């Protein structure tokens, strides 16, 4: 069996920044450090940070007075931000991905101008909850759609004063279909100046598409609650190839590999490379040969941590 590795795969700049913020806060201020929601959607990362002194909570009320709080990479609503600022906290750091913040600013701008806004996204995802929570104009409207069917059923106040934006981790193909429906249903709707789906999501979907062309099966390293990891597995499955979303090498089932000559491996944007290396080692134990990395788009984007946290610390592998 041959192992093919997608390129690019794994950590994106927003995830790197978010994890670094938690690591550096622990290093500078000591444990415990409170984080609202999982800083990124990866079990290994969350467990590793817990071992170092991070405490993950869902409600601001769970944070004791005088503590240090960090918002996750997915962002928070205006209401959550205001609640945190009203508390007697020592420090408050925001690990929201800058590309998510860009979408937040689009929604806030629409709210100020009185435009109705439509968000393409998955209900219940923390990024969607945070983005929807940027809209506060009582005379306007903020709506969530997930599919073309949602668009056809949507009723708005003023079809001539509409804009749309998207969750950053969606399927490029699925989103395109929803945007087509929006443009047909509401001809005067205005979209973002630049695509809201982030570079890392787009690049990893392109890379896994190339990978699936050559692989018999594809293993996607990522947690079940990771939106971008799920989209990678779905893309492969739509191409007619089996794809399995796994948290770690221990999840691999030998029968998946029966008859496969070429096994593709990729990782979602919140999955660290150490998990990919463990998957490769497991596949070799099961008889696979050396791994070969495909060519792909080079990524050089770096997002800086807050200036208060710019110290050298040991990072998660």
UniProtKB/Swiss-Prot annotation:
One of its GO terms (molecular function) is 4-hydroxy-3-methylbut-2-enyl diphosphate reductase activity. It comes from Yersinia pseudotuberculosis serotype O:3 (strain YPIII). Belongs to the IspH family. Binds 1 [4Fe-4S] cluster per subunit. GO terms for biological process: dimethylallyl diphosphate biosynthetic process; isopentenyl diphosphate biosynthetic process, methylerythritol 4-phosphate pathway; terpenoid biosynthetic process. Keywords: 4Fe-4S, Iron, Iron-sulfur, Isoprene biosynthesis, Metal-binding, Oxidoreductase. (2E)-4-hydroxy-3-methylbut-2-enyl diphosphate binds at residues 41, 74, 125, 168, 226-228, 270. The active site is at residue 127. This is 4-hydroxy-3-methylbut-2-enyl diphosphate reductase. It catalyses: isopentenyl diphosphate + 2 oxidized [2Fe-2S]-[ferredoxin] + H2O = (2E)-4-hydroxy-3-methylbut-2-enyl diphosphate + 2 reduced [2Fe-2S]-[ferredoxin] + 2 H(+); dimethylallyl diphosphate + 2 oxidized [2Fe-2S]-[ferredoxin] + H2O = (2E)-4-hydroxy-3-methylbut-2-enyl diphosphate + 2 reduced [2Fe-2S]-[ferredoxin] + 2 H(+). Its EC number is 1.17.7.4. Homodimer. Isopentenyl diphosphate binds at residues 41, 74, 125, 226-228, 270. InterPro entries: LytB/IspH (IPR003451). Its cofactor is [4Fe-4S] cluster. Pathway: Isoprenoid biosynthesis; dimethylallyl diphosphate biosynthesis; dimethylallyl diphosphate from (2E)-4-hydroxy-3-methylbutenyl diphosphate: step 1/1; Isoprenoid biosynthesis; isopentenyl diphosphate biosynthesis via DXP pathway; isopentenyl diphosphate from 1-deoxy-D-xylulose 5-phosphate: step 6/6. Catalyzes the conversion of 1-hydroxy-2-methyl-2-(E)-butenyl 4-diphosphate (HMBPP) into a mixture of isopentenyl diphosphate (IPP) and dimethylallyl diphosphate (DMAPP). Acts in the terminal step of the DOXP/MEP pathway for isoprenoid precursor biosynthesis. The keyword Cell membrane does not apply. [4Fe-4S] cluster binds at residues 12, 97, 198. HAMAP family: IspH (MF_00191). Dimethylallyl diphosphate binds at residues 41, 74, 125, 226-228, 270.
